[in-house]
Amino acid sequence: MMLQKLLIFLKENSAKILIKYDGERDIKKYTVRLLYSDIKCRSLGSDTDLPCAILKEIFVENEFVGVEEILDFYNSTISYGIEILKNQFGGGSVISIVIAEKDGAILYTIHIQNTNGTRCLTGVDYIELYENLLLEKI
């Protein structure tokens, strides 16, 4: 149900969520943004060391019902996946996650870049994507 609300929110706002970990930075290692498809709309979010706070700010500002559920999803799934990928590919990696709506489903894109190369996977199952990335070497 919670992801259904997120799906509707993204579709109605023609928006995507970007969560990026940049291990090359010394501070504010995360970027969290709500990106609108309409380039006339300003994106919301910022660079931070506290991604949950920025996510909460974005959803509260947009009067999203179910903010706590989104934060739980971030903490239990997205953040967990980022930590595992950091351990696999190195803390200096850049890991980007884009969450978007496409054809009535939530679509995840995970992009990893480190000194050895880059890798990008897209699909509807976030956990399956990051598990597949763990099997690969870049």
Region roles according to the model:
Residues M1-K16, L55, F59-I95, G117:
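Negatively charged, low-complexity tracts enriched in Asp/Glu with abundant Ser/Thr
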Residues E12, Y36-S37, N87, L135-K137:
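Generic detector of low-complexity/intrinsically disordered segments
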Residues Y21-R42, A100-G117:
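Short aromatic-glycine-(Arg/Gly/Cys) micro-motifs in beta-strand/loop hairpins
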Residues D26, I84, S93-I95, L107, ...:
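Polar low-complexity intrinsically disordered regions enriched in Ser/Thr and small residues
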Residues I39-C52, N114-E128:
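A short, exposed loop/beta-hairpin motif centered on an aromatic-Gly-Thr core
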Residues T48, S79-E83, L129-Y130:
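Generic low-polarity alpha-helical segments
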Residues L50-E68, T122-I138:
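Repeat-associated, polar segments at repeat-unit boundaries in modular proteins
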Residues G90, Q113-T115, I138:
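Compositionally biased, intrinsically disordered low-complexity segments enriched
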